[in-house]
């Protein structure tokens, strides 16, 4: 049985990955006391002792606002931590699958679905750190796979960590009769975490490099919210969702991803629903 080391196994994605795949892989899920990703000696010691076949690196500080306020901590975890995991993976011969982010695209001016081969110019701390982590990790482990994940969501599930997200925010607003504003000048993929977890093992066999990994979405965030609210209420013009024309005044914020590269490289096995299709599936 293949041995999979998961960093961040108690987090949003990691906990769901462990639950889904624990019967089909030997899952290694060390806590911080067993393996501290900011300590290269700790990471190498654990990896050399356990000798995983694959390392899925999910541990990160992913709150973009927090990273802006604490850039040194973000760098230590999101860049240096990733490099430590890469060094240990290379030393023990494990395939590394590392989660990056669509935030690397947040300074781009292109329209449409963005591909991995375009130059990127991230404008926030988190995006810059994830981009540097990609570059340094692939320098250490050329066969590593860096997955640029999107904003993710799940329904509330007992025993699973859940944070405020797109679907829960809208569902709660409908229940409470509140209103929410969503930006008109933003385009981004929004992905059901269940699909990420289901498709992640297919990424183990990808050639080394950077891949977008999530739902495509041609709609702006306001349009997406309107369509999801309509799914829940049956009302086409709900007063719950309001347009926000003020956010991103400098330029349209487009971080929508194209999945063509991963789809081709996986022989078609990595195939996400688009954002609206995923929302319909999740709501069944």
Please report, for each region that a protein language model flagged, where it lies by residue.
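Conserved C-terminal active-site "lid" loop/helix of NAD(P)H-dependent oxidoreductases
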Residues: 220-226, 241-282
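Rossmann-fold cofactor-recognition segment
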Residues: 29-39
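Catalytic helix-loop patch of NAD(P)-dependent Rossmann-fold dehydrogenases
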Residues: 76, 81-84, 104-147, 152-153, ...
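NAD(P)H-binding glycine-rich loop region in Rossmannoid oxidoreductase-like domains
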Residues: 37-77, 88
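N-terminal Rossmann NAD(P)H-binding glycine-rich loop of SDR-like oxidoreductase domains
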Residues: 2-21
């Amino acid at each position: 049985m293949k041995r999979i080391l998961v960093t961040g196994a108690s987090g949003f994605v990691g906990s769901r990955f462990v639950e889904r795949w624990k019967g089909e892989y030997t899952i290694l899920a060390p806590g911080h006391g067993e393996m501290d990703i900011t300590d290269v000696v700790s990471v190498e010691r654990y990896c050399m002792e356990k000798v995983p076949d694959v390392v899925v690196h999910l541990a990160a500080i992913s709150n973009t606002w927090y990273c802006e306020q604490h850039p040194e901590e973000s760098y230590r975890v999101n860049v240096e931590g990733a490099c430590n995991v890469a060094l240990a993976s290379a030393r023990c011969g494990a395939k590394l699958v590392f989660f990056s982010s669509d935030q690397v695209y947040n300074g781009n001016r292109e329209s449409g679905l963005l591909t991995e081969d375009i130059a990127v110019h991230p404008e926030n701390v988190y995006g810059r750190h994830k981009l540097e982590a990609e570059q340094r990790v692939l320098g250490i482990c050329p066969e590593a796979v860096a997955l640029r994940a999107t904003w993710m969501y799940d329904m509330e599930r007992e025993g699973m960590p859940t944070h405020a997200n797109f679907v829960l925010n809208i569902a709660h607003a409908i229940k409470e009769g509140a209103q929410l504003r969503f930006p008109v000048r933003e385009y981004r993929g929004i992905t059901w975490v269940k699909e990420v977890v289901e498709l992640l093992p297919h990424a183990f066999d990808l050639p080394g490099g950077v891949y977008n990994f999530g739902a495509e979405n041609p709609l702006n965030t306001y349009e997406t919210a309107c369509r999801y609210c309509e799914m829940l209420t049956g009302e086409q013009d709900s007063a719950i969702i309001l347009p926000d024309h003020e956010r991103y005044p400098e330029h349209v914020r487009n971080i929508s991803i194209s999945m063509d590269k991963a789809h081709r490289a996986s022989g078609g096995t990595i195939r996400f629903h688009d954002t609206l299709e995923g929302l319909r599936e999740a709501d069944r």
